[in-house]
Structure formats: structure tokens, C-alpha cells
Design a protein with these regions (language model features):
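Short conserved AdoMet
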Residues: 24, 44, 94, 108-109
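A short glycine-rich, Lys/Arg-flanked "PGG" loop and its adjoining helix->strand segment in the class I
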Residues: 97-114
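Conserved N-terminal segment of class I S-adenosyl-L-methionine
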Residues: 1-83, 87, 100, 168, ...
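Short catalytic micro-motifs in class I SAM-dependent methyltransferases
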Residues: 87-94
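Conserved S-adenosyl-L-methionine
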Residues: 155-165
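Short, glycine-/aromatic-enriched active-site segment of Class I SAM-dependent methyltransferases
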Residues: 115-139, 143-145
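Active-site micro-motifs of SAM-dependent methyltransferase domains
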Residues: 73, 91, 122
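Active-site-proximal loop/turn and secondary-structure-junction residues that shape catalytic pockets
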Residues: 56, 89, 119-121
Length: 195
């Protein structure tokens, strides 16, 4: 099955390889939305790693900090990070625009944001128009929407990689003086819906 099982193991390894091919010295990392800590277990090239998730596992080591909390609009942390990593989180955020702006605030200048999101467009076209949108995935994320949200919140997409038909990996840089100019185009013809 392309959405469960071994696919997830392969996904995490591919995402780790994507990240380390770009930055092999992550320094100070915050991973947001990480209940299983599968990514952390694959890395050894960091100075400190903060896990932020309501169910984050606790580690008895000085350079790994677990924060059991949601990354919602009330969450507050004073630390700044070189790297933010999240996998299959963006589609779960209730306020993606505001929360991406918070990502930007958490990053040091020129910091890296690595995200993995489901390839909703593929699933919508090949399986069901609503596959991927449900009570946990409350809005539709395609490449155009993601580019728009990232640019609007001062992230410049440096690299993008499709992992099979399962996920899309993004590497973004924080850009403080970015001028965002993107038009959202209606890609769907709904004129025949009542025919």
C-alpha cells in the first residue's frame, strides 16, 4: 500500500537523505510534530535537537529537549533555531498562514525550513477527489498553494523533490526582505458540475 507500511520507512529515510544532501551540519534543530521521533533517530549531525509535539518522547541526553505541546497560536518559545523540520504537519495546522509566520520567527536569519507534505494532488486525481481531505486534513495543499503560503511568510523555496507519489519535500530559506508576488490560478473547471 502506498500510504502505509514500508512506504513510511522509505519516506523518512528519503527525507533524511534530502535534508543531509543540502545541509550536513544542522546545528540547532526544532522538529515540530514528531510523535514517533523517527527522523531524529536517523540523524547524528546536530548540536541540539528540540522535539515539539504533545506526545514527544523524552530522551535522557543533554542535547535533545522534548516539549510536550501543540504548535498552536498560543505556543511561545524564546529560542531561535538554524533548522526547522516537519513531516506531514502542514496539512494538520488550523492556521497555516499564521503558523508559517511563527516558523519564520523561530528561525535565525538565513535559517533552513525542511517540510514534507502529502502529494494531495496525485491522490485527488488518481484515487478520489477528496482523498486526503478529512477532519485531520482540513484544507487542500497542492504545489501552488504551498508556494503561495511559503512566499507570503518570507520563505524562498530552494529545492523541491517528489518522493514517489506519496510526498513532496521542500527546502526553504528564511528571507526577511522577500517581496511575494504570486497569483493563485483556478486550475479546476467546475462549469460542467451541474450538466
Amino acid at each position: 500500500n502506498e500510504v502505509i507500511g514500508k512506504t513510511w520507512t522509505n519516506h523518512f529515510m528519503a527525507f533524511k537523505n534530502f535534508i543531509t544532501s543540502i545541509n550536513n551540519n544542522l546545528q540547532h534543530v526544532i522538529e515540530i510534530g514528531c510523535p514517533t521521533n523517527k527522523l531524529l533517530k536517523l540523524f547524528n549531525n546536530y548540536d541540539s535537537w528540540t522535539l515539539l509535539d504533545p506526545n514527544a518522547l523524552t530522551y535522557d541526553t543533554e542535547n535533545i529537549l522534548s516539549i510536550n505541546s501543540y504548535f498552536d497560536l498560543s505556543f511561545n518559545i524564546s529560542n531561535k533555531y538554524n533548522t526547522i523540520i516537519n513531516s506531514h504537519l502542514l496539512e494538520h495546522l488550523y492556521f497555516p498562514n499564521e503558523q508559517l509566520l511563527r516558523f519564520n520567527d523561530l528561525l535565525l536569519d538565513n535559517g533552513d525550513l525542511f517540510i514534507s507534505v502529502p502529494n494531495m494532488e496525485y491522490y485527488a486525481k488518481t484515487h478520489s477527489p477528496f482523498l486526503g481531505i478529512h477532519f485531520e486534513h482540513t484544507y487542500y495543499l497542492n504545489v501552488v498553494n504551498i508556494i503561495y503560503l511559503l512566499n507570503k511568510n518570507n520563505f524562498y523555496i530552494k529545492n523541491m523533490l517528489y518522493f514517489e507519489n506519496h510526498s513532496i519535500f521542500y527546502h526553504c530559506k528564511k528571507e526577511n526582505n522577500m517581496i511575494s508576488s504570486i497569483d493563485l490560478v483556478n486550475q479546476y473547471n467546475l462549469s460542467n458540475i451541474n450538466s
